[in-house]
Amino acid sequence: MSEFLPFSRPAMGVEELAAVKEVLESGWLTTGPKNQALEQAFCQLTGNQHAIAVSSATAGMHITLMALEIGKGDEVITPSLTWVSTLNMISLLGATPVMVDVDRDTLMVTPEAIESAITPRTKAIIPVHYAGAPADIDAIRAIGERYGIAVIEDAAHAVGTYYKGRHIGAKGTAIFSFHAIKNITCAEGGLIVTDNENLARQLRMLKFHGLGVDAYDRQTWGRAPQAEVLTPGYKYNLTDINAAIALTQLAKLEHLNTRRREIAQQYQQALAALPFQPLSLPAWPHVHAWHLFIIRVDEQRCGISRDALMEALKERGIGTGLHFRAAHTQKYYRERFPTLSLPNTEWNSERICSLPLFPDMTTADADRVITALQQLAGQ
């Protein structure tokens, strides 16, 4: 059998090793100059005013919800077809996640679904830029402005995603992820961008014990050696080791995403003749970052179930992923919301399969996946 082809593999090289070596030799391992440089680079990438690096996108979501004073009695609108950390953070703060359905073919939450879910208790809306494509954020933001509700963009899949000519996160508040499978990675990490100066100040405190400054601030600006707690906070800062890797990856972003796009185009051309259904692209002008390439495997249409397809690909040495199992079908949320029905989400959650997609894949690797799909479709 050929070497196992994983669903994803980080694109690491000598540049990342050199960046880590530089940090180790500098003596400043935790939050410091590399964090500062990463934050500045994301302001340049997105065009937003403030950037706050954190230990994960989940951490970023947690402190953003906290800074917005979301808690018991509040509701937060979010799709169910998302990673469970968003729902978990809402729930841990005592608020209620209000899960809404998505478009059947783009898997994006729609402005109409969001607006129909608003109540007097709605405190925030969290749209997801899914799989590397953008949600219709202008329309969603307009709803937030009309009702006076905060919008927090889940941009975990959207480093390199553009909407109507502007990078995701160009205005408002958005949260990016640098997890190991993301378009750029530093193993674990995340970053928040915002145009709200007061929110940015609160996020910086909350990510570091509620202190007004961190150790690098004190060294750089000569502030008092003992910082003071201004509000209870967390230990969510990013180390400079991670930030240095993320910076190096960010410098390669155009190259990395171009390769993802080439593989996605190869898949799209082949799937035109197969029963497996890729996602539809959004109707609005955009640049897709191709974080994921997803097909829907309908047993009646394809002659094989999604789970059987994934197992058959595994037997052929090909890895796949599932993004995502709907949150409201998982034990805790199923028991908490037993009557919730989201038809489009449920239909897709039972059929979606993420194919291998990462920059170091070769054309031959993609051909191998396509050949396996052709065989499993009986062609």
UniProtKB/Swiss-Prot annotation:
- Highest taxon, organism lineage: Bacteria
| Enzyme Commission code | 2.6.1.87
Please identify the protein, giving its name as recorded: UDP-4-amino-4-deoxy-L-arabinose--oxoglutarate aminotransferase
* Alphabetized InterPro entries for the sequence: ArnB_NH2Trfase, DegT/StrS_aminotransferase, PyrdxlP-dep_Trfase, PyrdxlP-dep_Trfase_major, PyrdxlP-dep_Trfase_small
Q: Which family does it belong to?
A: Belongs to the DegT/DnrJ/EryC1 family. ArnB subfamily.
Query: Under the cellular component aspect of Gene Ontology, which terms does the record hold?
Result: membrane
Catalysed transformations (reactions):
UDP-4-amino-4-deoxy-beta-L-arabinose + 2-oxoglutarate = UDP-beta-L-threo-pentopyranos-4-ulose + L-glutamate
Looking up PANTHER family in the UniProt record yields:
TRANSAMINASE, UDP-4-AMINO-4-DEOXY-L-ARABINOSE--OXOGLUTARATE AMINOTRANSFERASE
Q: Which cofactor does it need?
A: pyridoxal 5'-phosphate
GO MF annotation list: pyridoxal phosphate binding; UDP-4-amino-4-deoxy-L-arabinose aminotransferase
The protein's job, in short, is: Catalyzes the conversion of UDP-4-keto-arabinose (UDP-Ara4O) to UDP-4-amino-4-deoxy-L-arabinose (UDP-L-Ara4N). The modified arabinose is attached to lipid A and is required for resistance to polymyxin and cationic antimicrobial peptides.
Q: How does it assemble?
A: Homodimer.
